[in-house]
Regions:
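Alpha-helical substrate-recognition element adjacent to the catalytic core
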Residues: 3, 8-181
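Active-site-proximal specificity loops/subdomain of glycosyltransferases
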Residues: 184-188
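Nuclease catalytic cores that cleave nucleic-acid phosphodiester bonds
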Residues: 191-192
């Protein structure tokens, strides 16, 4: 979790989360090039450690000498990797602390944002969260979410809605999905 702000009047919380190595340990790999011309996959966790060396200083990784990036090193982190992302979220290991905050945010119907270096279409990230809710992954509870959304509408004096699908879609539309490498951004140094 990056930030949490509490609104005292109604006890509402707003959350911001990073995806990789914060909510989930995704198996998606960055593609590197060995001195033999072989492509070698590197985890995002390892990439955080080695990224300043890639292309600057050859180093040993997974039994290979890495000399730079592969031809399309972040292909699985962009729109070309959308279907892989949707499949990987079904089984990727959850990161205990931040994941429990994510579950709390969703089950309570709190607005959240996903800020990630990934370059997927924002709608892919939104569909991914919907899939996780419908799966009941890691404590996410569709019924608790719907109950919270109905209660929110009541507290805010909004027209009652009982269509669960509409409530969840409306909720996810209020949440924000910021893949900073979507379009023209670079996943190599997304903070730039």
């Amino acid at each position: 979790m990056i930030n949490e702000v509490e609104e005292k009047k109604y006890g509402l919380k707003y959350y911001a989360f990073d995806w990789d190595d914060n909510l989930m340990k995704m198996p998606t790999q960055i593609i590197l090039m060995s001195e033999d011309g072989d492509e070698v996959g590197m985890s995002t966790e390892d990439f955080a450690e080695y990224r300043t060396e890639i292309g600057n200083t050859p180093f040993e990784y997974e039994g290979k000498t890495i000399v730079g990036f592969g031809k399309d090193p972040f292909k699985y982190f962009r729109t070309a990797g959308d279907s892989k992302f949707m499949k990987d979220i079904e089984t990727a290991p959850l990161v205990r602390g931040p994941w429990s905050d994510f579950v709390e945010a969703i089950n309570n119907g709190s607005v959240f944002s996903i800020i990630t270096a990934r370059g997927h279409n924002p709608n892919t990230l939104k569909k991914g969260v919907l899939k996780l809710i419908l799966m009941g992954r890691g404590g996410l509870d569709k019924e608790k979410l719907v109950e919270s959304l109905i209660k929110y509408r009541e507290i805010m004096g909004l027209k009652p809605v009982t269509d669960e699908n509409w409530l969840i879609r409306d909720y996810l539309d209020r949440c924000k999905f910021y893949p900073v490498s979507f379009g023209e951004g670079s996943a190599t140094n997304p903070e730039e």
